[in-house]
């Protein structure tokens, strides 16, 4: 090689250097350092001769200098790689320098001379600047921070950076500049002590250049400048890799402001970054589509696939996520300034008018964008700004955004209604105290929705278990019958007497396996998740724990608590006086009767169930021992509310007086008067309002059987979201069937009873009804697995499909022999579950589901049409059922599977349900959530049967495009919609349109009721599980007190 053979006196020709530049850097470490140094010096000598020409440089001159610089860069690269470590300048002159070329570069001020010459190149300045930036980029990347300490390197670097301000460069030059700035930010982040070099030295350098006439004074009128940050600002909204690198470097600068207050002060007071970010965000929002093209009947929110497919939305989300990151890492001054600009310059003037538009399409798009924003941002400061925006009463002529959103829950437009409920699902998922107070708690804190005689029950735990039984009993009769028929009837399975089935169901044949095959209420589940409440218990446990963790951070505690023993004050005295006057009018009959020493009932005349009140009782001793002392609704930090709200003084008492009441009859009259406040709500006649939000939800629930399937999915999910809150006040409305409610609308439990009666009346337990129920359930299961495997099917090859079908067929041959005719029909859907399937019943919104092992594939699969076991008599199934069977085993993919191949976006939009907000684009629930004793739960959930696999989980789970639906009932189809906003469910309509279920004698109304029955049945199981888990939470809380 020429480098090793050279004597050092000559300079190789250009043709000899080329091969060295092309050699891998690892092969160049055996070079001769002396030869490299001589060649480096010779190239500089030739370049310097061109630079010293007095005449303006010509094209050839510039090309010659650039060529020599290129070779010098290559030699520096070889030397730096050979040295591995730079130590300059040499502290001791005892030996040769470790990097002689670099030593020569610095000692001879080559960089400064090169910069001075570049200023005279005129129209060739950009080409020379590009080579300079390459040189600096190389040196910074290989020497890290060592060279920044040396003035021969730092001074020309600051000069070239200062001269780049305000300039417009070609793309290749911009790229090199941003890369260099990014590298400098990384070095400064690792060596904060060097930060002042670029802050103050840059200031001095700018002043010098102003004096020399090379640079114009800054427009801001100040020479204070953080040169790196200033150069990065113009690229903050750029697209592509250039914009990403610039934003990354700016974030490093923001993080540096936390370590250096001078940087924070400069960015907040002298830079324009905050106004630029906000105005850019508003401009990008204005470019978003004003009307979103809805391609599926169940579309309700923007998904990650939508973001990637819409360029304008991608740019907007990049800017929003950058603002979120700035608030997270920047100095407090910068953070506060950006939040103020965001609220005054984007949230109020841009989002406000967009949401308050009157056009329905515009409302849908604006609310979808707001929902996407709330799911994307994570910084509490930004979330507080958006909550303030929702509750602001001054910016929009006295109209609150939150009230406008609540009104849209009543919209007859199904798409607007679903988008609104999805938005409220996100809002409730924030677990924000202010929002919950405005939506629910401020209407419930007075306690007027609960009669006085029932308020002592609110903190009791036992009724929660009774509520679980209550919810299970509300299941429609046809669902109970279908569930009973679906149980395997095997004479080889002995009866287990320890588990008692529900009274409303026939005694099933018990299985030897306890745990995975049985739920907590004695309902046999076999290898299916159908009727397996354990899966709901697991989900409820995790959701409630997450909600409880967030609610513990609230400023107030919205629950019924013990009244303090002392200091009732004027409210106590006033209540006592009013009560005495009341009882004096009625005489002392019932009260005087207490002199006998026996516990008797105190009744109030003409106050009965019609007003929502029960007669006042002297509770037995055993009940008092279990109940909490007389309670009131209070907050932890609102003492004024305790004295100003008459409703909060409705029940007054103390634990010490409770004991006296129990032991001394002579004090009982006075103590009863002390505990009751009849000032306002004694004669309330059921006119208490629960607020517009709950009234809208109850109104939608009352039309449950008339709503579309997808509206009901979101509705049930929203109510489930409320039930997750560990607040007894909310439980008194949703989970406590033993507490009467006095409101101007039917209570939640009354509506559920009405719905059960309506379904039972219109869908009686007949053969036709059972067939329609089976079709509804099977179609929902079929579409869930179709959605879960849509992407996998698109990506798979014919070999993949062949192996998948073979696996399903083989696994189907291993089961199904012991199933009844109805069970076999229910299982007719060919579940496409493979070892790569993403179905995980325990995670509702995790956007990367785990695969299922081959060992449980058989639990999901069914026989194909050709291998299915026919009924013994060969004709027990009707011709209509045979057609249904053929439809779900063969024709289903042709009928509804075209959506996957035609529109990937539709598929991504389709994987949705109605209950959580953890489908943020970035945050996901932990995968390892578990509870004590949940081994059987996980076993039961993993071994799910396709006949009901998805219908027992995630009834109210919200999923995005990267998730696979975990619920049959909530895996909403995303195919093209042909029925408009109020079209009926696509799967059943498709079946009916082909005449496949004509023989079932089912009308369109009965099919709708069948869907409602299946959905309601599974939702009630979920509510039962939540009630049981909430009782566990209360026991834990009381045990820790």
From Swiss-Prot:
Keywords: Phosphoprotein. It comes from the Eukaryota. The modification Phosphoserine is found at residues 490, 797. Pfam families: DUF5917, KELAA, RAI16-like. InterPro entries: FHIP (IPR019384), FHIP_C (IPR045669), FHIP_KELAA_motif (IPR045668). Residues 628-637, 800-818, 903-925, 959-968 have a biased composition (Polar residues). Residues 619-648, 792-818, 858-879, 903-947, 959-986 are annotated as: Disordered. Residues 927-947 have a biased composition (Low complexity). PANTHER family: FHIP FAMILY PROTEIN CG3558, RAI16 PROTEIN-RELATED. Belongs to the FHIP family. This is FHIP family protein CG3558. It comes from Drosophila melanogaster.
């Amino acid at each position: 090689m020429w480098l090793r053979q050279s004597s050092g006196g000559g300079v190789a020709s250009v043709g000899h250097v080329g091969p060295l530049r092309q050699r891998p850097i690892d092969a160049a470490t055996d070079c001769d350092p002396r030869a490299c140094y001589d060649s480096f010096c010779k190239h500089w000598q030739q370049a310097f001769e061109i630079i010293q020409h007095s005449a303006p440089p010509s094209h050839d001159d510039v090309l010659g200098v650039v060529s020599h610089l290129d070779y010098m860069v290559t030699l520096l690269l070889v030397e730096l790689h050979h040295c591995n470590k730079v130590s300059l300048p040499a502290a001791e002159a005892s030996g040769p320098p470790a990097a002689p070329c670099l030593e020569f570069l610095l000692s001879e001020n080559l960089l400064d001379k090169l910069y001075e010459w570049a200023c005279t190149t005129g129209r060739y300045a950009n080409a020379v600047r590009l080579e300079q930036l390459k040189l600096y980029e190389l040196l910074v990347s290989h020497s890290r921070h060592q060279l920044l300490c040396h003035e021969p390197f730092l001074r020309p670097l600051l000069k070239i950076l200062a001269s780049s301000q305000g300039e417009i460069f070609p793309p290749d030059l911009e790229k090199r500049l941003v890369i260099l700035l990014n590298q400098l930010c990384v070095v400064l982040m690792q060596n904060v002590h060097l930060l002042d070099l670029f802050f103050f030295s840059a200031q001095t350098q700018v002043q010098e250049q102003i004096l020399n006439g090379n640079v114009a004074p800054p427009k801001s009128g100040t020479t204070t400048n953080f040169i790196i940050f200033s150069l990065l600002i113009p690229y903050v909204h750029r697209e592509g890799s250039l914009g990403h690198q610039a934003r990354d470097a700016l974030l490093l600068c923001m993080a540096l402001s936390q370590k250096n207050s001078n940087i924070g002060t400069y960015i907040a007071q002298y830079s324009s970054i905050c106004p630029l970010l906000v105005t850019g965000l508003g401009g990008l929002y204005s470019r978003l589509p004003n009307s979103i093209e809805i391609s599926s009947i169940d579309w309700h929110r923007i998904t990650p696939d939508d973001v990637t497919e819409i360029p304008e939305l991608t740019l907007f989300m990049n800017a929003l996520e950058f603002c979120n990151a700035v608030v997270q890492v920047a100095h407090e001054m910068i953070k506060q300034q950006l939040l103020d600009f965001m609220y005054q310059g984007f949230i109020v003037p841009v989002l406000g008018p967009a949401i308050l538009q009157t056009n329905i399409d515009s409302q849908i798009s604006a609310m979808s964008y707001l929902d996407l924003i709330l799911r994307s941002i994570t910084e509490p400061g930004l979330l507080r700004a958006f909550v303030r925006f929702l509750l602001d009463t001054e910016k929009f002529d006295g109209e609150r955004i939150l009230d406008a959103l609540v009104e849209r829950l009543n919209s007859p437009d199904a798409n607007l209604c679903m988008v609104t409920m999805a938005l409220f699902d996100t809002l409730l998922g924030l677990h924000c105290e202010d929002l919950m107070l405005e939506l629910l708690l401020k209407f419930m804190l007075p306690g007027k929705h609960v009669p006085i005689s029932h308020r002592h029950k609110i903190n009791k735990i036992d009724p929660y278990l009774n509520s679980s039984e209550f919810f299970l009993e509300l299941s429609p009769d046809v669902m109970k019958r279908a569930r009973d028929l679906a149980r395997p009837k095997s004479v080889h399975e002995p009866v287990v007497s320890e588990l008692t089935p529900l009274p409303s169901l026939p005694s099933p044949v018990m299985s030897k396996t306890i745990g995975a095959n049985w739920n907590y209420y004695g309902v046999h589940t076999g290898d299916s998740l159908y009727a397996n409440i354990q899966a709901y218990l697991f989900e409820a446990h995790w959701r409630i724990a997450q909600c409880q963790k967030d609610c513990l951070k609230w400023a107030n505690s919205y629950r019924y608590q013990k009244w303090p023993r002392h200091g009732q004050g004027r409210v106590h005295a006033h209540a006592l006086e009013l009560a005495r006057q009341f009882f004096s009018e009625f005489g002392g009959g019932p009260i005087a009767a207490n002199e006998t020493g026996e516990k008797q009932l105190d009744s109030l005349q003409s106050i009965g169930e019609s007003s929502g009140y029960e007669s006042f009782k002297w509770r037995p001793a055993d009940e008092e021992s279990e109940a909490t002392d007389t309670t009131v609704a209070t907050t932890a930090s609102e003492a004024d509310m305790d004295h100003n709200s008459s409703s909060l003084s409705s029940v007054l008492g103390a634990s010490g007086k409770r004991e006296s009441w129990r032991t001394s009859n002579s004090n009982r009259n006075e103590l009863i008067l002390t505990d009751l406040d009849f000032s306002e709500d004694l004669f309330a006649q059921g006119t208490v309002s629960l607020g517009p939000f709950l009234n809208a939800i109850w109104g939608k629930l009352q039309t449950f059987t008339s709503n579309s399937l997808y509206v009901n999915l979101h509705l049930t999910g929203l109510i489930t979201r409320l039930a997750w809150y560990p607040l007894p006040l909310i439980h008194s409305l949703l989970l406590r069937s033993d507490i009467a409610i006095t409101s101007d609308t039917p209570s939640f439990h009354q509506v559920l009873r009405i719905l059960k009666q309506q379904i039972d009346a219109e869908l009686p337990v007949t053969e036709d009804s059972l067939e329609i129920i089976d079709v509804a359930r099977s179609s929902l299961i079929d579409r869930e697995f179709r959605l879960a495997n849509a992407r996998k099917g698109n990506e798979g090859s014919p070999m993949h499909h062949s192996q998948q079908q073979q696996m399903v067929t083989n696994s189907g041959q291993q089961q199904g022999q012991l199933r009844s005719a109805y069970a076999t029909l229910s299982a007719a859907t060919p579940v496409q579950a493979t070892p790569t399937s993403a179905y995980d019943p325990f995670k509702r919104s995790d956007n990367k589901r785990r695969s299922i092992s081959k060992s449980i594939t058989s639990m999901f699969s069914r026989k194909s049409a050709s291998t299915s076991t026919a009924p013994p008599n060969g004709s027990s199934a009707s011709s209509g059922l045979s057609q249904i069977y053929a439809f779900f085993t063969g024709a289903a993919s042709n009928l509804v599977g075209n959506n996957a191949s035609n529109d990937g976006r539709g598929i991504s939009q389709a994987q949705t349900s109605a209950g959580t907000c953890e489908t943020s684009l970035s945050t996901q629930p932990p995968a390892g959530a578990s509870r004590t004793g949940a081994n059987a739960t996980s076993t039961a959930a993993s071994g799910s049967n396709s006949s009901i696999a998805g219908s027992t989980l995630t009834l109210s789970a919200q999923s995005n495009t990267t998730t696979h639906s975990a619920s049959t009932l909530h895996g909403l189809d995303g195919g093209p919609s042909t029925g408009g906003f109020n079209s009926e469910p696509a799967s059943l309509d498709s079946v009916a349109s082909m005449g496949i279920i004509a023989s079932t004698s089912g009308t369109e109304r009965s099919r709708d009721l069948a869907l409602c029955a299946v959905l309601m049945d599974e939702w009630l199981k979920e509510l039962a599980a939540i009630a049981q888990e909430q009782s566990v939470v209360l026991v834990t809380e009381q045990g820790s007190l």
